[in-house]
Amino acid sequence: MPRPHQPLLLQLLHGLTALLVPLAWLSGLVVYSQYDGRWGRLPFTLPGDWVDVHGSFGALLWPVALLFGVYAFGPGRWRLRQWGNALPLLALALALGSGKAMQEDWLREGQLHHLAYSLHLTAWLLLALAVAVHLVTLLRRGGWPLLLSMLKR
């Protein structure tokens, strides 16, 4: 069976996204635990201004996701027919769009009622589910060789 091969641009954009999304997601968990916590909190608190850390990851992710989206709808558009590939991009777009619509002081001031914040929380959950679905469908479709093809050049 031939080894799967991925284009270099896809590997770079996917790799950067795969690095930044978990960092943004985990920093968002810390922010949620510190400022909201309606559905639970972490059993510890971390020092620092995590709203700014989370926003920095979002700011780094924004141009990478934009380029990844352009690639996905250009040379990679045939891969979007598989919902396991399309779903994470849609969840990421919702997360970034709703994050851009928020003001960073809302959480510090306890303003949890804004629509943009509710959408951002929804996107946060959807992104976790979408990445899990992405990995499961990838493993079902091509197994470990396909997964490892994103890491090998």
Predicted features, each with a name:
Residues 1-153:
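Membrane-embedded alpha-helical bundles that constitute the cytochrome b-like, heme-associated redox core
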